[in-house]
Amino acid sequence: MKDLLQYAACFLAIFSTGFLIVATRTDCWMVNADDSLEVSTKCRGLWWECVTNAFDGIRTCDEYDSIYAEHPLKLVVTRALMITADILAGFGFITLLLGLDCVKFLPDEPHIKVRLCFVAGTVLLIAGTPGIIGSVWYAVDVYVERSSLVLHNIFLGIQYKFGWSCWLGMAGSLGCFLAGALLTCCLYLFKDVGPERNYPYAMRKPYSTAGVSMAKSYKAPRTETAKMYAVDTRV
């Protein structure tokens, strides 16, 4: 059961980390929902904006200005949150790999491996927090912006909805939460694995046997009175 939970958490962690990284690097956080011309598909990401022609499939991308330039608060905060989530998720996944029983790292220290799994689970739980905040905040902002335009009967020629990159960010964050929950539960389910449990009575028996044998081989010195009493009894 322990191995099954570890492998399930590892499976979730690797896909969640991949989803977060792909979501951060791709450009489809916003996609056009209603295009009056219907000749192109526009996608906006955290780093650039791309337009794909619907007829010939030609794709052109324009990068945003330098990171030091002024950008909307939504873009800057989402960048920071997603990069933080990527780093934490990657660190948690590497720590989890070292804690797996099938990995030959500290094979004689199972209690340390359990602690590594606990640390990995904690880091993954923390990694899911900025990821879900950044993804949901971006999606809500896009929805509110679109709803406000519709409410005021304003049509700018194109309206956006959140795209698959935003969905990947949410999925990766939820996967980190689930993997972290599995790993932290593993520590309590298998908390009996420790240094005391690794050395059972059978391994401690030689020490007690040696102590008994040494006690048997040890003979207290006889006093002069005892020696005289022994001689008298022989006579």
From Swiss-Prot:
Catalysed reactions, semicolon-separated: Mg(2+)(in) = Mg(2+)(out); Ca(2+)(in) = Ca(2+)(out); Na(+)(in) = Na(+)(out); K(+)(in) = K(+)(out)
GO annotation, cellular component aspect: bicellular tight junction; plasma membrane; tight junction
Main location: other
Record Pfam families: PMP22_Claudin (PF00822)
Keywords: Cell junction, Cell membrane, Ion transport, Magnesium, Membrane, Tight junction, Transmembrane, Transmembrane helix, Transport
Ranges in the topological domain labelled Cytoplasmic: 1-3, 101-115, 191-235
Outcome of mutating V235A: Loss of interaction with TJP1. Retains localization at the lateral plasma membrane but does not anchor at the tight junction
UniProt GO MF annotations: identical protein binding; paracellular tight junction channel activity; PDZ domain binding; structural molecule activity
GO biological process: bicellular tight junction assembly; calcium-independent cell-cell adhesion via plasma membrane cell-adhesion molecules; cell adhesion; monoatomic ion transport; paracellular transport; positive regulation of calcium ion transport; renal absorption; transepithelial transport
This protein's record includes keyword Magnesium: yes
Subcellular location: Cell junction, Tight junction; Cell membrane
Transmembrane segments: 4-24, 80-100, 116-136, 170-190
Annotated motif Interaction with TJP1, positions: 233-235
Membrane topology, Extracellular segments: 25-79, 137-169
InterPro entries, alphabetized: Claudin (IPR006187), Claudin16 (IPR003927), Claudin_CS (IPR017974), PMP22/EMP/MP20/Claudin (IPR004031)
Paired cysteines (S-S): none
Membrane topology type: Multi-pass membrane protein
Domain notes: The first extracellular loop contains negatively charged amino acids that affect cation selectivity.
Function: Forms paracellular channels: coassembles with CLDN19 into tight junction strands with cation-selective channels through the strands, conveying epithelial permeability in a process known as paracellular tight junction permeability. Involved in the maintenance of ion gradients along the nephron. In the thick ascending limb (TAL) of Henle's loop, facilitates sodium paracellular permeability from the interstitial compartment to the lumen, contributing to the lumen-positive transepithelial potential that drives paracellular magnesium and calcium reabsorption.
Subunit structure: Can form heteropolymeric tight junction strands with other claudins. Interacts with CLDN19. Interacts (via PDZ-binding motif TRV) with TJP1 (via PDZ domain). Cannot form tight junction strands on its own.
Family under the similarity heading: Belongs to the claudin family.
UniProt protein name: Claudin-16
